A protein has these predicted regions:
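Residues forming the flavin
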Residues: 1-197
Length: 197
């Protein structure tokens, strides 16, 4: 919840001071494999929204309204990938890699455009989630409980499992056991690189 992030960032004395507004954060970590893991597009008092541009794929994104007054804080957790992950040398291999995982998320959902979601505690312990706790997912048209590792590359899953506890050491409550991971954010950067000159 946003209130937990406010408490962690501002401290008990100032957590509810209206003039400060909803707290944000920026986190980064380098996994043992060398992959970068970082928070992206942190939306204080925000929500997770649908952002698919193609049929049969799920893409999530985040946003905050002007007041930043929604009950949840959210951000994308991004893990770096590169041409070695794409499995091909074609100029559009990155686009196909992106589409593949977006389709996997759609298939995993099994319920149309509802996004796969899992509680942080269960993701870290590699077990399915049975129900939601006190944190209400904000994604519309809704979420379904699934093991999100099924729509992520193994290397990405491993890097996230390494980074989330580290982030929790930086921001108390970041890995709240009932926090919700909603999959999949694939559009943080372009899968095609154009070199100039």
């Amino acid at each position: 919840p946003q209130s937990l992030i406010n408490l962690a960032q501002y401290g008990e004395k100032y957590a509810e001071l209206p003039i400060l507004g909803a707290a944000d954060y920026k986190l980064n970590y380098h996994a043992a494999t060398g992959r970068a893991v970082y928070s992206f597009c942190m939306c204080p008092g925000g929500q997770v929204v649908a952002a698919a541009s193609e049929e049969g794929g799920i893409v999530t994104n985040g946003m905050s309204l002007h007041a930043r007054a929604a009950e949840n804080a959210n951000s994308a957790l991004i893990v770096s990938v590169d041409a070695r992950d794409f499995g091909a040398n074609d100029v559009l291999a990155g686009v196909e890699f992106q589409r593949y995982w977006e389709r996997k998320a759609y298939e995993l959902s099994g319920e149309g455009y509802k996004a796969p979601a899992q509680l942080v505690r269960d993701f870290l312990k590699d077990r399915p989630s049975k129900d939601f706790g006190e944190i209400n997912p904000s994604y519309r048209p809704g979420v379904v409980l699934r093991e999100i590792k099924e729509c992520l590359p193994e290397e990405v899953t491993a890097a996230l499992r390494e980074a989330i506890p580290y982030f929790a050491g930086k921001i108390k409550g970041f890995a709240h056991p009932q926090a919700v991971l909603t999959a999949i954010e694939t559009r943080s950067s372009s899968p095609v690189r154009i070199l100039r000159n």
